[in-house]
A protein has these predicted regions:
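Signature of N-terminal electron-transfer/Fe-S-associated modules in redox systems
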Residues: 2-4, 10, 16-231
Length: 231
């Protein structure tokens, strides 16, 4: 099953990475995990400029469709299919990951409107707000800052850039959900304290965001960095 194989595919670091790795090689891998894939996927979907343009207004969502990353998609899956499978299997958006299938780990997190949502336990039907995945964060930021043209197509969301600068990921499997949670938090609180960051990641219903590599301190540093960049 593709979802079950993904941790192996993405956990490409050597044993040296257990000590946070060496500078340039580790940074290159982090950029690949966090940034390059997001920009490439967004561009491949509809073309970066068209994606930015589509986000200037919220399209109507016809019955049987969902609005994802600024684009309305007709869905073929049955009504009880979890949103995660629609995103990954139909729309080929692999930012959200299958972790537990119970909404308990956060690897599958996406934004519905401005709020973090566990897509593995959320049916795709009846969603009235836009869904944003990791791939859609650059366009979301471009819309917020009114960026156009080349600047819009090449600019990562500050949260993504902060994850790169702080070299947060180790295996990287959970980090899409972590970044989504960070965007949710910074939308509600533009300058969170360390205690507030910890609370957001550990007390978000239905359960905490889990990182089995233990990157929590780097995540806190990245959220602080992103907050400064977004100020």
């Amino acid at each position: 099953m593709d979802d079950q194989q993904q941790p192996t595919v993405e956990a490409t670091g050597s044993s040296d990475d257990a000590g946070r790795g060496s500078g340039s090689s580790r940074r290159a891998r982090v950029v690949g995990l966090v940034g390059a894939a997001a920009v490439a996927a967004a561009g491949a979907a509809v073309g970066a400029t068209e994606l930015i343009r589509s986000r200037t207004s919220t399209p109507a969502i016809p019955r049987g469709s969902i609005l994802v990353n600024g684009v309305v998609h007709r869905v073929q899956s049955t009504a009880d299919t979890p949103l995660l499978y629609v995103l990954r299997d139909e729309l080929v958006l692999h930012g959200p990951k299958f972790g537990c299938g119970l909404g308990q780990c956060g690897a599958c997190a996406v934004l519905v409107g401005d709020r973090e949502t566990r897509s593995c336990v959320t049916a795709w039907t009846g969603l009235k707000d836009e869904v944003t995945t990791l791939e859609g964060l650059p366009a979301r930021w471009a819309k917020e800052k009114s960026l156009t043209g080349g600047a819009a197509a090449s600019t990562l969301h500050p949260v993504q850039q902060a994850w790169i600068d702080e070299q947060v990921p180790q295996c990287g499997y959970c980090q899409s959900g972590m970044m989504i949670m960070a965007v949710d938090l910074l939308t509600r609180n533009s300058s969170p304290s360390e205690a507030q960051i910890r609370d957001a990641f550990t007390n978000t219903p239905p359960s905490p965001h889990l990182c089995r590599c233990g990157t929590y301190m780097s995540i806190i540093a990245a959220v602080h960095r992103a907050a400064r960049a977004m100020a």
